[in-house]
């Protein structure tokens, strides 16, 4: 059984995300899902012995410890060896934790669908290019560090905004949009693809 630890950044969408994962099975078995607030310690997260980690959406900026708590430490200390999916703030935190820059989006977006162009790999494997994705954010990755590939973008008034990143060496994938939103056409596919990668990583 796959043990999934969700780091909750105090977001109303966290349990929608948990529900999406709870609907999935890996090799016929349901997931063992543990949710912990970002006020947990790194040792608490480590002691849960996760096979996979999800970093939830949340308010605030990844540079502020009060906003992200243990999130950045999880990304740099545990996600180097444990498959991790970051969502919204999870992407921003990953980019920031590995030396990138987070800035303001051209305009705050809360609950609008935009087409996502992606590379067809990782969490995007087999998904339609240009599928609609629900955006709920005012921050974006403005400078992505070299250790990440940009895996997805969306066009916002002629400007390409980062919608997905994938670490080149570690099993970290992140999306800026919300796969658990009803506005996202392939959200279940993103979740399934992540779990497929987790299962393969677990066997390796």
Swiss-Prot record:
- Catalysed conversion reaction: chorismate + L-glutamine = anthranilate + pyruvate + L-glutamate + H(+)
One biological process term from GO is: L-tryptophan biosynthetic process
Name the EC number(s): 4.1.3.27
- Say which enzyme class the record assigns: lyase
GO MF terms held by the record: anthranilate synthase activity
Q: Which residues form the active site?
A: 88 (nucleophile), 178 (for gatase activity), 180 (for gatase activity)
Q: Which Pfam families match?
A: GATase
Which parts of the sequence belong to the Glutamine amidotransferase type-1 domain? 3-204
The pathway noted for it is:
Amino-acid biosynthesis; L-tryptophan biosynthesis; L-tryptophan from chorismate: step 1/5
Q: Which GO terms describe its cellular component?
A: cytosol
Binding sites annotated in the UniProt record for L-glutamine: 58-60, 138-139
> Which key words tag this protein in UniProt?
Amino-acid biosynthesis, Aromatic amino acid biosynthesis, Glutamine amidotransferase, Lyase, Tryptophan biosynthesis
SUPFAM superfamilies the record matches: Class I glutamine amidotransferase-like
List, alphabetically, the PANTHER family matched: MULTIFUNCTIONAL TRYPTOPHAN BIOSYNTHESIS PROTEIN, MULTIFUNCTIONAL TRYPTOPHAN BIOSYNTHESIS PROTEIN-RELATED
Q: What is the protein's quaternary organization? A: Heterotetramer consisting of two non-identical subunits: a beta subunit (TrpG) and a large alpha subunit (TrpE).
Q: Which NCBIfam families match?
A: Anth_synII_Halo, trpG_papA
Q: Function of this protein?
A: Part of a heterotetrameric complex that catalyzes the two-step biosynthesis of anthranilate, an intermediate in the biosynthesis of L-tryptophan. In the first step, the glutamine-binding beta subunit (TrpG) of anthranilate synthase (AS) provides the glutamine amidotransferase activity which generates ammonia as a substrate that, along with chorismate, is used in the second step, catalyzed by the large alpha subunit of AS (TrpE) to produce anthranilate. In the absence of TrpG, TrpE can synthesize anthranilate directly from chorismate and high concentrations of ammonia.
Name used for this protein in its record: Anthranilate synthase component 2
UniProt organism field:
Haloferax volcanii (strain ATCC 29605 / DSM 3757 / JCM 8879 / NBRC 14742 / NCIMB 2012 / VKM B-1768 / DS2) (Halobacterium volcanii)
Query: Which classification does the entry list for the species?
Result: Archaea, Methanobacteriati, Methanobacteriota, Stenosarchaea group, Halobacteria
């Amino acid at each position: 059984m796959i043990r999934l630890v969700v780091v909750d950044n105090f977001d109303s969408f966290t349990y929608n995300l948990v529900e999406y994962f709870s609907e999935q099975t890996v090799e016929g078995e349901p997931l063992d899902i543990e949710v912990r607030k970002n006020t947990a310690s790194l040792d608490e997260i480590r002691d849960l012995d996760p096979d996979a980690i999800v970093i939830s959406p949340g308010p605030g900026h990844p540079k502020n410890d009060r906003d992200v708590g243990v999130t950045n430490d999880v990304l740099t200390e545990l996600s180097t060896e444990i498959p991790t999916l970051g969502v919204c703030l999870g992407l921003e935190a990953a980019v920031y934790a590995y030396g990138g820059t987070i800035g303001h989006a051209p305009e705050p977006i809360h609950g609008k669908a935009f087409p996502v162009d992606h590379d067809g790999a990782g969490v995007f494997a087999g998904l339609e290019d240009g599928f609609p994705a629900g955006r709920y954010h005012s921050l974006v990755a403005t400078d992505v560090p070299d250790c990440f590939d940009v895996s997805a973008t969306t066009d916002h008034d002629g400007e390409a905004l980062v919608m997905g990143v994938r670490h080149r060496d570690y099993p970290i994938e992140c999306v800026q949009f919300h796969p658990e939103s009803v506005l996202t056409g392939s959200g279940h596919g993103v979740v399934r693809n992540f779990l497929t990668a987790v299962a393969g990583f677990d066997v390796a």
